[in-house]
Design a protein with these regions (language model features):
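Non-catalytic regulatory/interaction regions at protein termini and inter-domain linkers
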Residues: 1-109
Length: 109
């Protein structure tokens, strides 16, 4: 993940500074896709990647499709939430150093 995103970002900046906006509909994660068991580690690590970059990602988790335990993990790995069109700082967010240490230490930076 890290190398692919780094490469994409570097390529996007070659002709001058560019802001990056990305969205991801996450319903695919409900399927038995190889590696999906590491999704929250990826989500947490993404915070390392986008730090200090002109990059905004919006992960779209359908609250009617994901169970409560998964949504709580989502909240712990995302610094902001959007609900009813309002962006707010997420009080449940955990810094990746903390979240990864407690939940997926093999993915620590």
């Amino acid at each position: 993940m890290d190398e692919g995103l780094d490469s994409f970002f570097e390529e996007s900046q070659k002709s001058g500074p560019r802001n990056i906006r990305a969205t991801a509909e996450m319903v695919w994660a409900l399927e038995a896709v190889p590696g999906v068991e590491h999704l929250m580690a990826y989500e947490s690590r993404l915070n390392y990647f986008i730090e200090n970059k002109p990059w905004i990602s919006i992960c779209l988790y359908n609250l009617t499709k994901f169970d409560g335990a998964t949504i709580m993990q989502v909240l712990r790995t995302h610094p902001y939430t959007i609900s009813k069109g309002v962006i707010t700082e997420n009080p449940f967010y955990q810094n990746p150093d903390i979240w990864l240490k407690e939940n997926a230490p093999q993915f620590l930076k």
